[in-house]
């Protein structure tokens, strides 16, 4: 589960490498985010010449989580790292490529562009 102050790897080519969670969106008093949830982050590490710079406040969607997510059939999916994709206000990704697998739960939350760009959907 992703909470405030959690650091995540960025799984796109927007220019950010690592972000720190500021807030979990979706209701007052919400503490944790899971796969498919939108969070507000600040960029902690960035590559030179990228779209986003260090210190920028951005929105991102969680695409991989160490704690995993429970599916309707009772199975769980877990990943080796916490990762996110930086998005615009209309839920489209700011980068043009997605690195690594993403969870199928993104399709349920209408992040179809991220699902189509991903090399593998688990």
UniProtKB/Swiss-Prot annotation:
<keyword id="KW-0694">RNA-binding</keyword>
<comment type="function">
    <text>Binds to 23S rRNA. Forms part of two intersubunit bridges in the 70S ribosome.</text>
</comment>
<dbReference type="Pfam" id="PF00238">
    <property type="entry name" value="Ribosomal_L14"/>
</dbReference>
<dbReference type="InterPro" id="IPR019972">
    <property type="entry name" value="Ribosomal_uL14_CS"/>
</dbReference>
<dbReference type="InterPro" id="IPR036853">
    <property type="entry name" value="Ribosomal_uL14_sf"/>
</dbReference>
<comment type="similarity">
    <text>Belongs to the universal ribosomal protein uL14 family.</text>
</comment>
<dbReference type="InterPro" id="IPR000218">
    <property type="entry name" value="Ribosomal_uL14"/>
</dbReference>
<dbReference type="GO" id="GO:0003735">
    <property type="term" value="F:structural constituent of ribosome"/>
</dbReference>
<dbReference type="InterPro" id="IPR005745">
    <property type="entry name" value="Ribosomal_uL14_bac-type"/>
</dbReference>
<comment type="subunit">
    <text>Part of the 50S ribosomal subunit. Forms a cluster with proteins L3 and L19. In the 70S ribosome, L14 and L19 interact and together make contacts with the 16S rRNA in bridges B5 and B8.</text>
</comment>
<protein>
    <recommendedName>
        <fullName>Large ribosomal subunit protein uL14</fullName>
    </recommendedName>
</protein>
<dbReference type="GO" id="GO:0006412">
    <property type="term" value="P:translation"/>
</dbReference>
<keyword id="KW-0687">Ribonucleoprotein</keyword>
<dbReference type="GO" id="GO:0022625">
    <property type="term" value="C:cytosolic large ribosomal subunit"/>
</dbReference>
<keyword id="KW-0699">rRNA-binding</keyword>
<keyword id="KW-0689">Ribosomal protein</keyword>
<dbReference type="GO" id="GO:0070180">
    <property type="term" value="F:large ribosomal subunit rRNA binding"/>
</dbReference>
């Amino acid at each position: 589960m992703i909470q405030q102050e959690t650091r995540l790897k960025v799984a796109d080519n927007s220019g950010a490498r690592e972000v720190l969670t500021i807030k979990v969106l979706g209701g007052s008093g919400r503490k944790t985010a899971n796969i498919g949830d939108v969070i507000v982050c600040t960029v902690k590490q960035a590559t030179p010449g990228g779209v986003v710079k260090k210190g920028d406040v951005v929105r991102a969607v969680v695409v991989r989580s160490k704690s995993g997510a429970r599916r309707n059939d009772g199975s769980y999916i877990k990943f080796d790292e916490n990762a996110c994709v930086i998005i615009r206000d209309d839920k489209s990704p700011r980068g043009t490529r997605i690195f690594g697998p993403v969870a199928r739960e993104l399709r349920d939350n209408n992040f179809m562009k991220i699902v189509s760009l991903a090399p593998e959907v688990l």
